């Protein structure tokens, strides 16, 4: 299981959506944080390089170019747009996917985990339910053989998203269960693309740096949702 954490507006949803679309692996995406119009518009921009303004207009007017529509159709991704899904609803969606395709998806995305309704929870600790949810998603990954990615927030000092976020910067300190935790922050010099910096702050299977100061820098053009290596 992988946890991807960042401040609001940093680009964590764009990062994971671009990964799902470009990998072209069978994906079930629980998009609790964004509606269908937003996700389709983002997807059009990611695949075409169009500006978000152009993509949203094309989606609204149902005038997406045929070549782009065909590209979208060929990507094996299904979305669930429940704004606050329960664990039962997540299980039902997975069972329906398995019944339809006779297999579980290679990738499951939960965007984001704070939108999931859990029955466990302590009135004095709003994040106790999230700890249980991590156990649940971890077990889901084991049972389905899927890569499960959960998106999550960070603590107040890192909400600006302009500096490296350590493992301790995860909201609710729920990094115990996931095998991998990535944190994202963005840097801009005011000219050209932003740098979307990805820190591996936990990795049971390889190198990590809990401080977040060791990161991979990706080129991020927010207007067109393009995320690439700088030397692409």
UniProtKB/Swiss-Prot annotation:
Which GO MF terms does the UniProt record name? ATP binding; DNA helicase activity; single-stranded DNA 3'-5' DNA exonuclease activity
Which Pfam families does this entry report, sorted A to Z?
A: DnaB_C (PF03796)
Question: Lineage, please?
Answer: Viruses, Duplodnaviria, Heunggongvirae, Uroviricota, Caudoviricetes
Name of the molecule in the record:
Gene 65 protein
- Which BP terms does GO give this entry? DNA replication
> Do you know which InterPro entries this protein is assigned to?
DNA_helicase_DnaB-like_C, P-loop_NTPase
What highest taxon heads this organism's lineage? Viruses
